[in-house]
């Protein structure tokens, strides 16, 4: 990438995704090594979320659709922060309802709450907290390079994705 530095640049934060091996909505194991050499966009959600996830997931879906239309080599990963309720079967139904393209987007589960809390904090400096009847979690999208380093951080609640799309198009070739 040449020219001016992106407003979304996260390289100075020196965030690196911790190794993982979790299960996607199709019951398949997905691990960090599956993304070696590839760009991927990650977020944290839970399917019963009443507040921010109903904004984040359609935004991620819009970015997925753009990446497919532009033929970008970009995968998408949503880590569930409610693994007790977001089982493989539940995630499969959820992804079918929202029109996820399984070839590009994995919704992950297969761990306990403590593990995803540690993973989110270690990898993204993003705390996950369970409250009495909800979860508090990051609303950011993290663009990860083929070496597992977070290189961009985007606002997952953005009402206009045009700047994010343009940045992804410049970064992911």
Regions found by a protein language model. Give the residues of each.
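Short loop/turn microsegments at loop-to-beta-strand junctions
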Residues: 17-18, 39-40, 138-140
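Thiol-/selenol-based redox modules, centered on thioredoxin-like
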Residues: 126-173
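Second-shell loop/turn segments in exported
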Residues: 42, 46-49, 80-81, 105, ...
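Structural microenvironment flanking redox-active thiols in thiol-disulfide oxidoreductases
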Residues: 57-119
């Amino acid at each position: 990438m040449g020219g001016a530095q992106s407003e979304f640049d996260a390289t100075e934060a020196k965030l690196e995704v911790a190794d993982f091996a979790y299960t996607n909505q199709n019951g398949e194991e997905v691990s960090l090594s599956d993304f070696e050499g590839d760009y991927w966009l990650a977020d944290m959600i839970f399917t019963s979320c009443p507040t921010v996830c109903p904004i984040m997931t359609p935004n991620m879906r819009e970015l997925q659709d753009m990446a497919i239309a532009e033929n970008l080599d970009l995968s998408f990963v949503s880590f569930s922060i409610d693994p007790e309720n977001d089982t493989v079967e539940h995630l499969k139904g959820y992804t079918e309802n929202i029109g996820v393209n399984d070839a590009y987007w994995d919704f992950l589960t297969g761990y306990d709450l403590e593990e995803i809390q540690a993973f989110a904090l270690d990898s993204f400096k993003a705390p996950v907290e369970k409250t009495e009847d909800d979860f508090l979690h990051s609303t950011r999208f993290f663009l990860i390079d083929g070496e597992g380093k977070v290189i961009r951080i985007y606002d997952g609640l953005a009402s206009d994705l045009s700047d994010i799309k343009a940045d992804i198009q410049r970064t992911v070739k």
